[in-house]
């Protein structure tokens, strides 16, 4: 603010802009050579798809359990979505992925680590290799997380991270695209809106790579500004790791307090999944929609607001594939339909104490017990 340099590009004194410094720091955090900062994670997914060569009309696979920016990125790229079913633990169904890849001919997968739930990434990588699929990871909910010691965002062709206010690093809004592919990085920088200032980037490929792309890559003006970058940069490194530890502590407190609640399940997390749980999901299997609405109302009456993925209408941030009518005819996803019908979602603010988590669990248990008793 003191410098007045809120835009990342222009004549400078040779110093890295805050955006370029953020790109360099985040690339180093993940051990990757390239990072491109954009104005949102949705923009980073769109740019990743374009930079990977996805053309209008191309089939792109994507797990159906996600939030609206993912189908939005597919629509923005003009892709034809091929939605993949989910398992009971909310992760992508790898058997259905193989079936859909073979039947559709799709060669790109936009994988959403929705609400921080990470599938078996080793097996997924094998499936992608077997089917000739390029993997792009939506890591909006997994900054700092990984599978078997390897960070999300580093398993495929590109990873896309969010800096939106409810994510693991908060600059209000913003997206970070990471890759080890120099051509994808150069194209992403040019698509983001670098003009011919790409040399000012902090984690970029060599000039020769840009020469291959700079004359035939449009400027979409999706770049990040210096203000959100300046907010995000200090939150990386030790602070990011500390927040992950604190979120997981709260997840442990609440999941343990909910364990054994009649009519409620919290999926087990595999030992290989190094999650960062900024939210908690649970299922109410077999409970009728009216009963779930009653449960939610009882919780809300005691100050606990829970989101529900089985609602007929989209609400707030919450929607499911049946609501995305811009995709055309709804795709049949039988297991997801059953799972989403009872799926509930709660954020875990870092201000929660262990007694707070116990109190939340008590509200959930008591409210659900009332609903189940009324059905008996």
What are these regions (language model features)?
Residues 142-148, 155-278:
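Active-site region of PLP-dependent enzymes
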Residues 7-13, 17-59, 73-77, 83, ...:
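Phosphate-binding glycine-rich loop
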Residues 48-102, 299:
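Conserved PLP-anchoring active-site segment centered on the Schiff-base-forming lysine
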Residues 89-171, 176-184:
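Active-site phosphate-binding strand-loop segment of PLP-dependent enzymes
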Residues 1-12, 213-216, 347:
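N-terminal "arm"/small-domain region of PLP-dependent enzymes with the aminotransferase-like
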Residues 196-208, 253-256, 294-333, 338-343, ...:
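Conserved PLP cofactor-binding pocket of PLP-dependent enzymes
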Residues 162, 270, 277-288, 309, ...:
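Conserved PLP-binding active-site segment of the aspartate aminotransferase-like
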